[in-house]
Protein backbone atom coordinates (compact mmCIF):
# COMPACT_ATOMS: atom_id res chain seq x y z
CA UNK A 1 0.00 0.00 0.00
CA UNK A 2 1.33 3.43 -0.91
CA UNK A 3 2.09 5.82 1.93
CA UNK A 4 0.42 9.22 1.72
CA UNK A 5 2.81 11.93 2.94
CA UNK A 6 1.40 15.16 1.47
CA UNK A 7 -1.73 17.11 2.21
CA UNK A 8 -5.12 15.52 1.64
CA UNK A 9 -5.50 17.36 -1.67
CA UNK A 10 -1.96 16.56 -2.82
CA UNK A 11 -2.42 12.87 -2.10
CA UNK A 12 -5.80 12.79 -3.83
CA UNK A 13 -4.33 14.44 -6.90
CA UNK A 14 -1.50 11.93 -6.91
CA UNK A 15 -3.94 9.02 -6.87
CA UNK A 16 -6.36 10.59 -9.34
CA UNK A 17 -4.05 10.85 -12.32
CA UNK A 18 -3.08 8.94 -15.45
CA UNK A 19 -5.04 5.76 -16.05
CA UNK A 20 -7.34 6.49 -13.12
CA UNK A 21 -8.54 9.67 -14.84
CA UNK A 22 -9.14 7.65 -17.99
CA UNK A 23 -11.17 5.11 -16.00
CA UNK A 24 -13.26 7.85 -14.42
CA UNK A 25 -13.75 9.48 -17.81
CA UNK A 26 -15.11 6.24 -19.21
CA UNK A 27 -17.51 5.93 -16.27
CA UNK A 28 -18.95 9.41 -16.79
CA UNK A 29 -18.66 9.51 -20.58
CA UNK A 30 -16.05 12.28 -20.86
CA UNK A 31 -12.63 12.69 -22.41
CA UNK A 32 -9.58 12.61 -20.09
CA UNK A 33 -8.73 16.33 -20.37
CA UNK A 34 -12.21 17.49 -19.38
CA UNK A 35 -12.42 14.79 -16.72
CA UNK A 36 -9.16 16.00 -15.15
CA UNK A 37 -10.38 19.60 -15.19
CA UNK A 38 -13.62 18.58 -13.52
CA UNK A 39 -11.78 16.53 -10.88
CA UNK A 40 -9.47 19.47 -10.12
CA UNK A 41 -12.51 21.64 -9.34
CA UNK A 42 -14.66 18.96 -7.69
CA UNK A 43 -12.05 17.89 -5.13
CA UNK A 44 -11.81 21.35 -3.49
CA UNK A 45 -15.61 21.57 -3.56
CA UNK A 46 -15.93 18.30 -1.64
CA UNK A 47 -13.09 19.16 0.74
CA UNK A 48 -14.59 22.59 1.49
CA UNK A 49 -18.02 21.07 2.13
CA UNK A 50 -16.48 18.46 4.44
CA UNK A 51 -14.51 21.19 6.20
CA UNK A 52 -17.74 23.11 6.69
CA UNK A 53 -19.32 20.04 8.24
CA UNK A 54 -16.27 19.44 10.46
CA UNK A 55 -16.54 23.03 11.74
CA UNK A 56 -20.18 22.58 12.75
CA UNK A 57 -20.31 21.39 16.38
CA UNK A 58 -23.58 19.58 15.74
CA UNK A 59 -22.24 17.64 12.74
CA UNK A 60 -18.52 17.18 13.32
CA UNK A 61 -18.87 14.18 15.62
CA UNK A 62 -20.87 12.30 12.99
CA UNK A 63 -18.30 13.06 10.30
CA UNK A 64 -15.41 11.88 12.45
CA UNK A 65 -17.30 8.73 13.40
CA UNK A 66 -18.02 7.96 9.73
CA UNK A 67 -14.35 8.43 8.82
CA UNK A 68 -13.20 6.16 11.65
CA UNK A 69 -15.81 3.44 11.23
CA UNK A 70 -16.67 3.34 7.53
CA UNK A 71 -13.62 4.57 5.61
CA UNK A 72 -10.45 2.59 6.21
CA UNK A 73 -8.72 3.59 2.99
CA UNK A 74 -9.50 0.39 1.12
CA UNK A 75 -11.22 2.35 -1.65
CA UNK A 76 -8.06 4.42 -2.16
CA UNK A 77 -5.82 1.35 -2.12
CA UNK A 78 -8.03 -0.48 -4.63
CA UNK A 79 -9.12 2.25 -7.03
CA UNK A 80 -9.28 -0.05 -10.05
CA UNK A 81 -11.57 -2.45 -8.23
CA UNK A 82 -13.69 0.39 -6.86
CA UNK A 83 -14.07 2.17 -10.21
CA UNK A 84 -15.02 -1.07 -11.94
CA UNK A 85 -17.88 -1.55 -9.48
CA UNK A 86 -16.40 -4.55 -7.69
CA UNK A 87 -16.58 -3.02 -4.20
CA UNK A 88 -19.67 -2.47 -2.07
CA UNK A 89 -20.68 -1.35 1.41
CA UNK A 90 -20.91 1.93 3.26
CA UNK A 91 -17.43 3.01 2.16
CA UNK A 92 -18.58 3.11 -1.47
CA UNK A 93 -21.95 4.84 -0.95
CA UNK A 94 -21.09 7.95 -2.92
CA UNK A 95 -24.69 9.03 -3.37
CA UNK A 96 -25.22 8.97 0.37
CA UNK A 97 -22.03 10.90 1.07
CA UNK A 98 -22.78 13.62 -1.48
CA UNK A 99 -26.39 14.00 -0.36
CA UNK A 100 -25.31 14.24 3.27
CA UNK A 101 -22.46 16.71 2.74
CA UNK A 102 -24.03 18.95 0.09
CA UNK A 103 -27.74 18.46 0.78
CA UNK A 104 -29.82 20.98 -1.16
CA UNK A 105 -26.60 22.52 -2.47
CA UNK A 106 -25.94 19.47 -4.62
CA UNK A 107 -27.68 20.73 -7.77
CA UNK A 108 -26.04 24.19 -7.61
CA UNK A 109 -22.69 22.44 -7.09
CA UNK A 110 -23.22 20.28 -10.16
CA UNK A 111 -24.28 23.30 -12.23
CA UNK A 112 -21.23 25.31 -11.15
CA UNK A 113 -18.79 22.47 -11.81
CA UNK A 114 -20.43 21.83 -15.17
CA UNK A 115 -19.95 25.46 -16.18
CA UNK A 116 -16.32 25.47 -15.04
CA UNK A 117 -15.28 22.19 -16.66
CA UNK A 118 -17.42 22.21 -19.80
CA UNK A 119 -18.85 18.79 -18.96
CA UNK A 120 -22.60 18.39 -19.09
CA UNK A 121 -24.78 18.24 -15.99
CA UNK A 122 -25.18 14.46 -16.14
CA UNK A 123 -21.44 13.82 -16.27
CA UNK A 124 -20.79 15.98 -13.21
CA UNK A 125 -23.78 14.46 -11.43
CA UNK A 126 -22.10 11.07 -11.93
CA UNK A 127 -18.62 12.34 -11.04
CA UNK A 128 -19.33 13.64 -7.54
CA UNK A 129 -20.62 10.31 -6.16
CA UNK A 130 -17.60 8.58 -7.72
CA UNK A 131 -15.16 10.97 -6.05
CA UNK A 132 -16.82 11.22 -2.63
CA UNK A 133 -15.84 7.72 -1.39
CA UNK A 134 -12.28 8.32 -2.60
CA UNK A 135 -12.10 11.58 -0.64
CA UNK A 136 -13.52 9.97 2.49
CA UNK A 137 -11.25 6.98 2.01
CA UNK A 138 -8.21 9.25 1.85
CA UNK A 139 -9.25 10.98 5.08
CA UNK A 140 -9.61 7.60 6.77
CA UNK A 141 -6.34 6.30 5.37
CA UNK A 142 -4.41 9.36 6.52
CA UNK A 143 -6.04 9.28 9.95
CA UNK A 144 -5.04 5.65 10.44
CA UNK A 145 -1.46 6.24 9.30
CA UNK A 146 -1.02 9.24 11.59
CA UNK A 147 -0.90 11.71 8.72
CA UNK A 148 -4.08 13.49 9.78
CA UNK A 149 -5.61 14.26 13.15
CA UNK A 150 -9.38 14.41 13.04
CA UNK A 151 -9.22 17.00 15.82
CA UNK A 152 -7.56 19.39 13.36
CA UNK A 153 -9.42 18.29 10.24
CA UNK A 154 -11.07 21.69 9.74
CA UNK A 155 -7.69 23.42 9.54
CA UNK A 156 -6.28 20.76 7.21
CA UNK A 157 -9.21 20.97 4.81
CA UNK A 158 -9.23 24.76 4.96
CA UNK A 159 -5.55 24.93 4.02
CA UNK A 160 -6.12 22.61 1.08
CA UNK A 161 -9.09 24.63 -0.14
CA UNK A 162 -7.12 27.88 0.08
CA UNK A 163 -4.26 26.31 -1.85
CA UNK A 164 -6.61 25.15 -4.59
CA UNK A 165 -8.24 28.57 -4.79
CA UNK A 166 -4.83 30.23 -5.10
CA UNK A 167 -4.04 27.92 -8.02
CA UNK A 168 -7.41 28.47 -9.72
CA UNK A 169 -8.39 32.14 -9.35
CA UNK A 170 -12.05 31.55 -10.27
CA UNK A 171 -12.46 28.68 -7.81
CA UNK A 172 -13.10 30.99 -4.87
CA UNK A 173 -16.12 32.45 -6.63
CA UNK A 174 -17.36 28.97 -7.50
CA UNK A 175 -17.04 27.74 -3.91
CA UNK A 176 -18.51 30.92 -2.52
CA UNK A 177 -21.52 30.79 -4.83
CA UNK A 178 -22.35 27.23 -3.82
CA UNK A 179 -21.22 26.94 -0.21
CA UNK A 180 -21.61 30.54 0.93
CA UNK A 181 -19.29 33.44 1.61
CA UNK A 182 -17.81 36.19 -0.49
CA UNK A 183 -15.82 34.18 -3.01
CA UNK A 184 -12.75 35.93 -4.34
CA UNK A 185 -14.39 39.32 -4.45
CA UNK A 186 -14.41 41.75 -1.52
CA UNK A 187 -12.75 40.06 1.44
CA UNK A 188 -11.17 37.42 -0.76
CA UNK A 189 -10.87 33.68 -0.38
CA UNK A 190 -9.90 33.96 3.27
CA UNK A 191 -13.17 35.62 4.21
CA UNK A 192 -15.12 33.19 2.03
CA UNK A 193 -13.55 30.24 3.81
CA UNK A 194 -13.98 31.98 7.12
CA UNK A 195 -17.70 32.10 6.41
CA UNK A 196 -17.77 28.49 5.24
CA UNK A 197 -15.83 27.18 8.22
CA UNK A 198 -17.49 29.42 10.78
CA UNK A 199 -14.52 31.71 11.48
CA UNK A 200 -15.06 35.43 11.93
Predicted regions and their residues:
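A structural "flexibility-hinge" signal
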Residues: 1-200
Amino acid sequence: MAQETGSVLEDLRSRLSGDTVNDIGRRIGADPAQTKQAIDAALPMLLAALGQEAADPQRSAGLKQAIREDHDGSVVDNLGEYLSGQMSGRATNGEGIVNHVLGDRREPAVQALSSKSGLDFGAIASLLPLLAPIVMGMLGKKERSGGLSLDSITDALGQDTRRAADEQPDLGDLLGSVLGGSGSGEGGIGDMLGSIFGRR
